[in-house]
Amino acid sequence: MKWGRTPAPVSSAVDSGERILAWSTLRGRPEGTYVIATDAALYVVDTNPLRLPWDCVTKATWTDDAILVVEARPNRQAPDQVWHLSPEDLQRLPTVVYERVTSNVVVSEKVALEGDLGIRIVARRSGDDMRWTVTFDPGLNAEDPDLRRRAEEALADLRSTLGL
């Protein structure tokens, strides 16, 4: 994030009405590629532009060598996808990304299904609604009908308990 005027390619890449909070060019990418954090979404602007609303981002972490690893579920039925981004400027981006991802989480609950293995149920604000995601631990077969049934029951129980 540079101080001063936001470059036109950055401003024009975001949806109308969104406020740009932080941005950076990306290391090792052609000129004109950016990562942009707005009040509503994370953008990756390159040859194949991407907009990830914050309620779709399931996890965002930083590696020791300043690579932003974003896990997101852009489609409610799809599994998480992972993007590795190398911003050149880290002044505000790490703080903004952390704040935006965590501020959308309303509830996060771990439910055991088999021993220590289970699911993580997360509700995130999505406009006026809630976006619920259920993520199976590695080692559990998410296609197993019995496990899916138990996961759906756990989700229904949690929603009922919370009145959501």
Segments from the language model and where they lie:
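Eukaryotic intrinsically disordered, low-complexity regulatory linkers and tails enriched in Ser/Thr/Pro
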Residues: M1-L164
